[in-house]
Each structure stands twice: as structure tokens, then as C-alpha cells.
């Protein structure tokens, strides 16, 4: 049985099998980029297709454990991330946008960029993905309608809306090209009319807007923290993702925990976490960081 607020020293493909379906609110993944970092673990796939096949396997597990409407942030090198996008829909996932992080010119210092014959890469890419709740809502509502034997007209009347053109009911259960997900107010009404107990917070996307933050981030300093992992992400960056797409008490999954930055961010923001890290050295460092963070005094 998987425990909360713990990192496991094992392959995430095996470890995630112990996590229940639809139980994770947010997943943050920073997998190996493949032939980008000069480390053995970044060269363990012989071909591009081998790498993509492996990614689809762990992404399938993330999609399974992620709750309906849950968010999945995936870091990666743009060249390899684009190879994964075509598989998202088949996994029940929807790409919302790409977040670009400008690391500044310091990142190319000392590199022989001229021989690359391309513009110097000074960015990190993050795919902002959700588990598509629109695919869930239509069959769920239709199932409740059939169970209660109600007509569309009866449901619209109970909702207090007109039935012209199918009414409000057809927007969420009809054959609309532009699928929609109900507002909280309408969901609460539907739960009463159709007699179901499914909290809105467990099927709606969580997004907490942050003033002045767009899809291009240039305020993240990759050099102010001591690095104990070659692809370590700044705590400020991870905290921003956590706070944007989860609430206090939610469960955050990190399949590639590295040295525990996501977990430290969860402790600081009062989220629960589950993590996996295969490398024993990094795992030990992550556990040490988390222990130190938990020992810090809190103001509240």
C-alpha cells in the first residue's frame, strides 16, 4: 500500500502500480531528456523510438492515477516533448499550453554554440496538460439520466432553463463540437436533479491564477540555489506550479523525484506528496532535504 509524504527508491513504472486510479490531484514530472545531459541515465535508450515508447508507458500510468480534471506538468527538451504530444489524446489527456522558461544568456556561457548551426537554446519547456474532464462528463450525466428515467425536457425544467434546441442539457450531453464542462453552480444543480454525490472539486480543473504570470517566465533564477543534481529545478519554479494547480491538502505525484525539490515545495505549501527516485544517491539526498525541511519551524 502506498503511503503519503514519502519517496520510494524504485522505478516509477513499478511504483505507480500501487497508486489507486484517479487519486492524484497534480503530477509534476521531470524525466530524463534523452541525450541532452552528459550522464549515463540520459543515454539508456538506443533510439528515439525506444525513448518515446518508454515515455508513453510512464505517461499512461500518470494518466491512470491522475484524477479527472487533474493537472500534469511535464518538463523536457522541446525536440523530444513534441514527439510525445501525439500520444496525449489516446491517454485521455489534453494539452493546455506550453510554458517557456527563459534561463538567460548565462546558460550558454562557454558552449561552442556556433557548431550547432541554430540559435542558442536558453529556455526550459514545460507542457501544461490536464486529464480531460469533458470526456468524463457526457457519459456520466447520460448514465444518471438513464438510471432515473428522465427526459431532457424534464431535466431542463428541473434546472430552471428553457428546452429550446435541447436546452442547457444538450450543451453537456449532446453532439457539440465544442465540448464544455459545467460551472460549479450548474454542477451542484445537476447533482441534485440527477441524485449523485460527486464533489465538483474532484472533477474540475484546479487553476489558481497568479497576477503577472504568463506562459513565458523570465523571473526564475536557475543559479541562486546550490545544485546537487545536474537537472535540478529551482524551488521557486516548482512552487509556482504546485500553487497554480493544486490546493492545500491535495496529493502531488513526482515520478522522477531527483533530489526532492517537488517534495520540499509540497511541504512548504501544505500539500501531500508521493515520489519515486530510482537512483540511490539522489534518493538519499532527497530524503535528507525533506527531513531538514520538515524540521524547519513554521509560523502558523
Predicted features and spans:
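Core catalytic lobe of class I
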Residues: 2-275, 281-283
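Conserved SAM-binding loop
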Residues: 286-287
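Positively charged, low-complexity nucleic-acid-binding target-recognition regions
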Residues: 4, 291-300
Amino acid at each position: 500500500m502506498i503511503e503519503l509524504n514519502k519517496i520510494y527508491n524504485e522505478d516509477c513504472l513499478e511504483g505507480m502500480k500501487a497508486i489507486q486510479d484517479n487519486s492524484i490531484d497534480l503530477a509534476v514530472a521531470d524525466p530524463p531528456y534523452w541525450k541532452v545531459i552528459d550522464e549515463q541515465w540520459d543515454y539508456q535508450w538506443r533510439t528515439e523510438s525506444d525513448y518515446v515508447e518508454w515515455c508513453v508507458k510512464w505517461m499512461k500510468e500518470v494518466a491512470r492515477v491522475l484524477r479527472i480534471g487533474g493537472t500534469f506538468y511535464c518538463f523536457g527538451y522541446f525536440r523530444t516533448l513534441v514527439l510525445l504530444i501525439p500520444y496525449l489524446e489516446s491517454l485521455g489527456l489534453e494539452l493546455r499550453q506550453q510554458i517557456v522558461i527563459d534561463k538567460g544568456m548565462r546558460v550558454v556561457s562557454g558552449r561552442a554554440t556556433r557548431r550547432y548551426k541554430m540559435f542558442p537554446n536558453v529556455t526550459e519547456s514545460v507542457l501544461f496538460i490536464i486529464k480531460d474532464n469533458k470526456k468524463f462528463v457526457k457519459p456520466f450525466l447520460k448514465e444518471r439520466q438513464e438510471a432515473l428515467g428522465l427526459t431532457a425536457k424534464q431535466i431542463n425544467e428541473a434546472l430552471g432553463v428553457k428546452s429550446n434546441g435541447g436546452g442547457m442539457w444538450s450543451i453537456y450531453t449532446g453532439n457539440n463540437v465544442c465540448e464544455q464542462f459545467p460551472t460549479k453552480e450548474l454542477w451542484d444543480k445537476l447533482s441534485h436533479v440527477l441524485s449523485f454525490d460527486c464533489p465538483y472539486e474532484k472533477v474540475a480543473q484546479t487553476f489558481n491564477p497568479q497576477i503577472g504570470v504568463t506562459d513565458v517566465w523570465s523571473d526564475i533564477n536557475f543559479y541562486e540555489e546550490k545544485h546537487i543534481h545536474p537537472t535540478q529545478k529551482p524551488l521557486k519554479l516548482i512552487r509556482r506550479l504546485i500553487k497554480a494547480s493544486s490546493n492545500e491538502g491535495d496529493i502531488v505525484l513526482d515520478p522522477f523525484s531527483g533530489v526532492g525539490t517537488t517534495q520540499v515545495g509540497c511541504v512548504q505549501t501544505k500539500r501531500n506528496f508521493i515520489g519515486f527516485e530510482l537512483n540511490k544517491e539522489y534518493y538519499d539526498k532527497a530524503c535528507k532535504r525533506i527531513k531538514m525541511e520538515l524540521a524547519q519551524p513554521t509560523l502558523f
